Amino acid sequence: MTQFTTSQQAAITHDGHDVLVSASAGSGKTTVLVERIIQKILKQHADITRMLIVTFTRAATAEMRTKIQTALKKALTERRHELSGEDRRHLANQIAMVNAAKISTLDAFSLQIVQTYYYVIDLDPGFRLLTDETERYMLQERVWDDLREQLYASDEAPAFEQLTANFSGDRDDSGLQDLMFELIRQAGATTDPKAYLEGLATPYAPEKWEATFSQQIWPRVKGQLLQIATSLTQASALANQLPNPIWYQQIQADLAPLQTLLETNAPTYDTVRSVLISHEFAAWSRISKGLDDADKDTKNAAKDLRDAAKKTWQNKLAPTFALAAEQIGDLLREAQPLVATLANVALKFEDALTAEKAARHVQDYSDIAHNALRILQQKDPQTGAPIADNYRASFDEVMVDEYQDISPLQEALLAAVSTTTPGDRFMVGDVKQSIYGFRLADPQLFIHKYQTFQDAPTDPAAPERIILAENFRSTKNVLAFTNLIFSQIMDPEVGDLSYDNAAALRYGALDYGDAHPAVKVLLYSKATSDEDSSDASELPGDADDNEPVDIATGQTQLVLAEIQRLINDPDAQLWDRQAQEYRRIHYRDITLLTRQTSQNSLIQTQFAAAGVPLFVADTKNFFKTTELMVMLALLKVIDNQKQDIPLVAVLRSPIVGLSADQLALIRLAAKQVPYYDAVTAFLQAEPKTPLAQRTHDMLTHFFNQLSHFRDLARENDLVTLLWAIYQDTGFLDYVGGTPGGSQRQANLQALIDRARTYEAGGFKGLFAFIHFITLMQKQDQDLAMPAQVDPDNDAVKLMTIHKSKGLEFPVVFLMQANKHFNMRDQTGTAILTKQGIGIKWLDPETRVEYELPQYQAAKAARQNQTLAEEMRLLYVALTRAQQRLYVVGATMSGNQLTSADKTVEKWAAAAEGEARVLAPQVRSGATSYLDWIGPALIRHPQARGLAETTIKPALVGDETEFTIEIDVNPQVTPTATPEKVSDDSGTMVDLSAWFKKAYPFQAATTTTGFQSVSEIKRAFDDPDTIDLVNADRFLGPKPPMRDLTAPAFLTETPSGISPAAIGTATHLLLQLVDLAKPITMASLRALRDQLTTKQVIAVDVAKHIDLTALIRFFETDLGRLLLAKPQQVHREVPFSMLLPADQVFEALADDPGEDVLIHGIIDGYVSDEQGVTLFDYKTDHNPNTAVLVDRYRGQLNLYAQALQDLQPKPVLHRYLVFLRTGTVVDLVASGAGK
């Protein structure tokens, strides 16, 4: 039975009021939620159909329903005899009712409301759900195009033209379109979209400017002033320690005006501006007389703090107050009508979009949610009571999972169906894992309740906060590392929440073993400390997807090296929590987490080159498959055949099949014209060569097909056109015969399904369909289903942090920690927030663009939101790890790779300050995860080897174990590029003649072009071989069958142990024995027992290894040679080589010129100044040495030839070591090797 903690038990049992459960990562929140439901049913006879249980995904809904039903069945089975008859019937009834319970997503619950009460808002119930983002976008695009034309032709044209000019570029008006779509999306997340849009222009009213400043701008400015004051106060305290008061006086002069402002109650814009523009930071005094080294360090530290304050002053405050109040008034008088026009157009667009959806009988999920809220606010025609009351009366409790991801609209829906006095809501989530801002989730809703609800309130009706801090997922160091970072970077100012003792993770997984591996930070760095050039004007995030390939490759190589170490190192182990023992690490235990998928291709390439299996969970490659690219190119040509790139793609594809030579021949017909015109010219000319004639015929056939397809496209639907293409070209059948054929055919079928869905949405026409597909590609939409992780697939997993939420992995690598945050949405002509809009106003006469204060406020708000969400993403990434955690990045300056010492120096400067939490300007100025992690680590005792920073008092005694490993330009072994095979234009042939012709190389069909020595060994009867293939065809002396004694491990021993297993174990012992130490019976037993303990060799097999035979071997001349030169001994050496086929297969003696690729593994060789000594172990029982030498001569010859190819030294000796008899034969000395 599960043992719950005190806080978990409280979350399970406390009710009669609203309960907010703040459940940290790995704290078992879903288990608690399910247990709460079970306990209510078991102990309170609650009815599950009177509970509303909402989650955020359909998968989570199905999982919860299953868990509840399973738990109830288990309770009925285990407690059947102790339950009364009534209790058993109740429990059985609840099990049956689970499928009917209201366990659903919020979208599904909203849909149910609409489908039940559609008539009270006059909604047509026959609507179709508009779930495809691209289809929704196209619908918006069509409505916007119509509205735009109407506006250009109306009396509002001048105002609309100015609107377009202000928010669009010089080339087109897509900027205004994008802004309009985003406005509608932002408004859709509110409870009243119309009110949101109507209120956009209010903050721009000149007469309300001071109110706008006081409510929206001054709070931000005050926060920045407090940051500056904090830095200056710290600098002042340092300067006061110096013998000369000049620096203290300078800092006090800087502090005085700030303190005056901060003490002023509700200062006006002019008051603040006058102080800011009138104050100048005096030049820092360079006096050094009378200062010892410690004083100089103190002085420099004070200067650094003052410089940081000055930078914030100049870079963040000054732009906000660049204009005088009179100038702002003038600009607002110009800007307010512009914003009013924008709001007016947005309202018209929203109305037109609603009308179009009604005409098409479609509703998206935002429409459904708003309609559900409208319905809940209406009265029931039958009872006259508010419909919301009907729902409140039907639910005893409303339970919400993942509450941190709620939007204001969803919160309003939940509030409408919940009881308020006392509350009946149970909300569980973790605001530190709120990472769906792009879906307009509002974590402030959770934070407000977190800050206002009480821990253990005395009033039984008061809302309660319960914190689940115990983490049952991760080892101590993973949790300590996470706490170490977040206790220094997250607070209400930057991060929205204080990461205090209540928020910190606590170790709860007491079943882990003793080992808690240290967290590792792996950094790819530059070798020298040369000055790096970087574009200071480049905004953070501008080059987010353009990280230099060599930097990304370097980081990937670091990861690959560490993965190979983990896999190969027997001491690198994981604790198996089920078996309660340590085990080796497998590839499937390892997961790579990335912020984005932009480097996935590069990572896949590097892993493939290294031979490390990789499973990519975030696959979006439907439109990148060859068959889809060919089909899309053909559709474009059918729509417009004068498109060069699609036309050439189709001509080169299997649909037409022209070679590169044929394409060049066409181009020669007309060199300086579009390719379609060159094709036309070629077809009009008389073919003069067989190749030209064949090309002419192929083009003629294709253009006849193309004409037919164009007719079909005009007269029929898309599905008919696509089926005709598949049938007439045979393309569907063709791809079925290629590798992965069934999947390729499924992809082509999916294209037809997509076309059918597209036309069902009311869209028509090939051109629009092509545009639809193009939009899907641009918006990163895909038809391919997300790949599912196969637990039996032994491969490293690669996925985004978003995809990993809710999952856990034994080993986690957080990749690209140096990658810039994406701040691009803070640089446009307009920035949207939940409060409204900030715009840049473009003077139509001077074309000068002004950043209005409202824009500055919106920009700051958006930046804070972005940083807070990035911080939460980092938290999610770190807390996915169960036992081993790696943070991987590069030492960067801007977008340039820099040296480690520069990066460490930057971290040390950022870590200044006595407070545990890093300075606000350091955290708000971060552009990557490393900008937070580095300063947080550099001030820790374990980082003393990197920088001589002062260990902060708050970190003294911190037991977090981590290492920072810096690799300077790791050597990347380039992958060999296969030689390109030239295209063969070929000629037309008579296929019937082909079928009648006798194949001249019939013998070769009974062999393979790729042979392992294990297959060829049959010619030599190697007893190490288990799989014997085509033995009668191998070249070499074939002893009479009567002389063939079965080798030792092809027969079974009396003990029942396979001789093959004994032979393999013997070889393994010889491979791993330490030749640098004396070989004794005790050392061999110790090695055997070690391999047995690690389960490399089975215990019953180990007992049958003949250790005496091994001792006897090392007493021979060859054995003593190995012991004398251990550094020059090479064991288990793989090789591959090409041999003429007639040297391997007797049947091919008459077919010279053919080659066979041979691969195998040599037992070992010794290389010294004179040459190479080759040796190979055998375990035959046959005492006839002459027969054995004859049997293995060919095999040793192959090995010797391979060694000669691998290295330049001659092979002087070829030893066969017969372990059973203790005989060592040199084939060269005996003459048997010839």
UniProtKB/Swiss-Prot annotation:
BP terms from Gene Ontology: double-strand break repair via homologous recombination
Keywords on record: ATP-binding, DNA damage, DNA repair, DNA-binding, Exonuclease, Helicase, Hydrolase, Isomerase, Nuclease, Nucleotide-binding
Annotated EC: 3.1.-.-, 5.6.2.4
InterPro entries: AddA (IPR014152), DNA_helicase_UvrD-like_C (IPR014017), DNA_helicase_UvrD/REP (IPR000212), P-loop_NTPase (IPR027417), PDDEXK-like_dom_sf (IPR011604), PDDEXK_AddAB-type (IPR038726), Restrct_endonuc-II-like (IPR011335), UvrD-like_ATP-bd (IPR014016)
Any one GO molecular-function label of the UniProt entry: double-stranded DNA binding
Catalytic activity of the protein: Couples ATP hydrolysis with the unwinding of duplex DNA by translocating in the 3'-5' direction; ATP + H2O = ADP + phosphate + H(+)
Domain UvrD-like helicase C-terminal, first and last residues per copy: 507-806
Keyword Zinc attached: no
Any Pfam family matching the protein: PDDEXK_1
UvrD-like helicase ATP-binding domain boundaries: 2-475
A Gene Ontology cellular-component term: DNA helicase complex
Annotated positions binding ATP: 23-30
Nucleotidyltransferase found in the keyword field: no
Listed PROSITE patterns: UVRD_HELICASE_ATP_BIND, UVRD_HELICASE_CTER
Essential cofactor(s): Mg(2+)
Function field: The heterodimer acts as both an ATP-dependent DNA helicase and an ATP-dependent, dual-direction single-stranded exonuclease. Recognizes the chi site generating a DNA molecule suitable for the initiation of homologous recombination. The AddA nuclease domain is required for chi fragment generation; this subunit has the helicase and 3' -> 5' nuclease activities.
Subunit structure: Heterodimer of AddA and AddB/RexB.
UniProt record similarity statement: Belongs to the helicase family. AddA subfamily.
Record's protein name: ATP-dependent helicase/nuclease subunit A
Organism: Lacticaseibacillus casei (strain BL23)
Originating gene: addA
